[in-house]
From Swiss-Prot:
NCBIfam families: Obg_CgtA, PRK12297.1, PRK12299.1. The keyword Magnesium applies. It is found in: Cytoplasm. The keyword Cytoplasm applies. It comes from the Bacteria. GTP binds at residues 166-173, 191-195, 212-215, 279-282, 310-312. Mg(2+) binds at residues 173, 193. An essential GTPase which binds GTP, GDP and possibly (p)ppGpp with moderate affinity, with high nucleotide exchange rates and a fairly low GTP hydrolysis rate. Plays a role in control of the cell cycle, stress response, ribosome biogenesis and in those bacteria that undergo differentiation, in morphogenesis control. GO terms for molecular function: GTP binding; GTPase activity; magnesium ion binding. It comes from Anaplasma marginale (strain Florida). This is GTPase Obg 1.
Amino acid sequence: MSFVDEAKIHVKGGKGGDGCVSFRREKFIEFGGPDGGNGGNGGSVIFVASSAVNTLLYFRYNQHIRAENGKAGSGKGKFGAAGRNRVVEVPVGTQLYDEDGNTLIADLNNIGQQYTVAAGGRGGIGNAQYKSSTNRAPTYFTYGTLGEEHCVLLKLKIVSDVGIIGMPNAGKSSLLSRCTASKTKVSDYPFTTLEPHLGVAYANGCELVLADIPGLIENASSGAGLGHKFLKHIERCVILLHLVDCSLPDIVSAYELVRQELKLHSQELTGKQEVVILNKCDLLSEGEVREKQKLLESSTKKEVITLSMGDELDSLIVFLHAQVKKAVVTEPSDTSFDPFLYVHYNKK
């Protein structure tokens, strides 16, 4: 299945049903009076964040989303039926922008979170509602109003506890496969991973969602390699798990290159808590591994964990789970986006 993380769509709420002009017609009742009912409201287009979908692939083949129109009113005071809402599931982490992609409309980053993208029109009023002491037989009514209609740009930023980052071929996909049941493609050449992968790891009662982010190379923040397309997915990770290939001749440069690309993409990324792992240590002797570990710790001023292919991973998962909980508690709340200040288009 293709990983689609952007889509431009057209949404339209249902038109309200028209009001009705009708008069009561029964035997022996000469002046029955008006009995035209109101029209039903049009349905709305509603997006719901769901864990059942992972990409925006649905919108590649369904670029026009519209809700049902309301039904017209009828005689005998019958109101028209309301149009059914069009409820569409989107992945958790979906952001809605205006057509130009400049204004954020909604950010659906919690399961079950809803947003009405295009409200339905109001139903028209039947002539029965216009009856008064001075007008016993009104013959006028109102038409139902049109539903809202917009072009919307959808962008997906996957949500995970841990984002696994590093240079191409650093062993990110292998680690994800070992920690979880994710069947990611693994091979000994760069850019094996062409799209983000999610997996859930369990150990000693701890549950952890990990994301394998495609490898970053120099100038990734400017679009080189696969960086420009996938750097944005790191923004939603609580902490970063930075893998460095132990077999590289210059591990410090490899580490700093990835950190630099994160900084160029967004200054906030460099502020995220980071766990550094020296991977593929089984390819070197213990002495060489110890030497490179000290070198990387001296450069990063962080504790560096060593990892080999045959190592047991439960303790690592428990450790990462504790770091995630700590980061969630200490992380300042994001005040840059207020859900009560969502842009809500006016009806046309």
